[in-house]
Amino acid sequence: MSESPLVLPRRLAIRILHAAQTAQPGSIRGVVTARAGQPSGLRVGSDTPVADETVWAALWSCPQAEAVPSAGELVPGQLSLVVSLNTKGVLEMRAWQRQGDTASERVLQIRD
């Protein structure tokens, strides 16, 4: 049985990609927060959501590498979003979860 796609609101995806792009040549780390189980916010430089939020995904960028983490970079049971700025003119965001000793990619859809 396949997992259902993850859905990220377009405005939030744009905020994430913008934060990664403006941090160049540095990287970003933070979390995507959720309200009522749905991704709703971005906290760059922090892994602590506010009172009515939960962590939906860990987030980091790789300015000079692909958006492909090793299993060791992933926390078991936690979704991770990785942004790559490695390809000139193209920003890439991919979702990952650790499955045993491997990094398993999840389908990520951006919707209005």
Where are the model-predicted features located?
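Conserved beta-strand-loop surface patch within small alpha/beta domains used
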Residues: 1-56, 65-112
